[in-house]
Curated annotation (Swiss-Prot):
Classification via Pfam families: IL10
UniProt subcellular location: Secreted
Disulfide pattern: 30-126, 80-132
Function according to Swiss-Prot or TrEMBL: Major immune regulatory cytokine that acts on many cells of the immune system where it has profound anti-inflammatory functions, limiting excessive tissue disruption caused by inflammation. Mechanistically, IL10 binds to its heterotetrameric receptor comprising IL10RA and IL10RB leading to JAK1 and STAT2-mediated phosphorylation of STAT3. In turn, STAT3 translocates to the nucleus where it drives expression of anti-inflammatory mediators.
SUPFAM superfamilies: 4-helical cytokines
Gene3D superfamilies: 1.20.1250.10
Molecular function terms, GO-annotated: cytokine activity
Family, per entry: Belongs to the IL-10 family.
Name the UniProt record assigns to this protein: Interleukin-10
GO BP annotation list: immune response; negative regulation of B cell proliferation; negative regulation of cytokine production involved in immune response; negative regulation of inflammatory response; negative regulation of interleukin-6 production; negative regulation of membrane protein ectodomain proteolysis; positive regulation of B cell apoptotic process; positive regulation of cytokine production
Keywords noted in UniProt: Cytokine, Disulfide bond, Glycoprotein, Secreted, Signal
Organism listed in the record: Papio hamadryas
Glycosylation sites: 134
């Protein structure tokens, strides 16, 4: 895991270096970002498809963790913060627990996490997509509900990851159109 963190740092440092006579690679990649977004979302969906059945079969709860209020936050003035917090929530709380539920899915969950980290890195590099500081109440509600579900929360959160991808897509589509 440490080597992947080092690799991410190298990618960031390489992307920030200015090219003679041109904008930075970061600026250039930001102009291409809207065109690359569908590919990044497809990669997330493909990675999720490898673990979707496992987690949805284990999710025995009837309630929904990722409610419509979260999508509304994604579409509202808190969209940036809600997206940032949800990415952090999945990377730091959900996926580390999900990796430990079955050795057969660990690699696939890790791959899904790496795809999500790549998206976060590109969003941060292109400040117009993720320039935020405020807290989202909907994200807090998701985190509280997740905590209350205890071990079952991992199954619930992972089984709804496709909803999260759809919310990311709705947020990014809105930002690109503005």
């Amino acid at each position: 895991m440490h080597s992947s963190a080092l690799l991410c740092c190298l990618v960031v440092l390489t992307g920030v270096r200015a090219s003679p006579g041109q904008g930075t690679q970061s600026e250039n990649s930001c102009t291409r970002f809207p065109g690359n977004l569908p590919h990044m979302l497809r990669d997330l969906r493909d990675a999720f498809s490898r673990v979707k059945t496992f987690f949805q079969m284990k999710d025995q709860l009837d309630n929904i963790l990722l409610k419509e209020s979260l999508l509304e936050d994604f579409k509202g003035y808190l969209g940036c913060q809600a997206l940032s917090e949800m990415i952090q929530f999945y990377l730091e709380e959900v996926m580390p627990q999900a990796e430990n539920h079955d050795p057969d899915i660990k690699e696939h969950v890790n791959s899904l996490g790496e795809n999500l980290k790549t998206l976060r890195l590109r969003l941060r590099r292109c400040h117009r997509f993720l320039p935020c500081e405020n807290k989202s109440k909907a994200v807090e509600q998701v985190k509280n509900a997740f905590s209350k579900l205890q071990e079952k929360g991992v199954y619930k959160a992972m089984s709804e990851f496709d909803i999260f991808i759809n919310y990311i897509e709705a947020y990014m589509t809105m930002k690109i159109q503005n």
